[in-house]
Amino acid sequence: MAYIFREDELPSLVSVVPGRERIFFVNQELANIDDLLAGVMHYKKDAASPLHLHKNCEHFYFIINGRATVESDDGIRPVGPGDMIFIPAEEKHRLRATEPLFYFEFQAPNRFKTTILEGTDADLRWERKDGRVWVQT
């Protein structure tokens, strides 16, 4: 079966920590698979993910529009449209928007645990615009 996901028909999640919004296209709830998690993210200027890592999961960002920095063990590097960022499992990382940012992300497999290294548990909390709460694991 082929799935077609339309962005305007999918639930939007807003981070409890201001400045981040995401829409999932592929996840357990939408496609009944846990092999990967995929969606788009919007960051306002200066919004950032916490410094974190994912156990048992590879993480990819493809920058569509805007500019950001990626922090990892290699230092802090600028990224922009057309750049693909690959974060191996268990590598600490942070993405910070230096201007409004739009990117596609996917994580595989979708059976992972996120560990916050700098930040709070609130960094993992997202509210659906319909009022339900989604907590990243």
What is each of the regions a protein language model found here?
Residues 39-54:
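Conserved short histidine dyad/triad with adjacent acidic residue
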Residues 32, 89-115:
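Ligand-binding loop in jelly-roll beta-barrel domains
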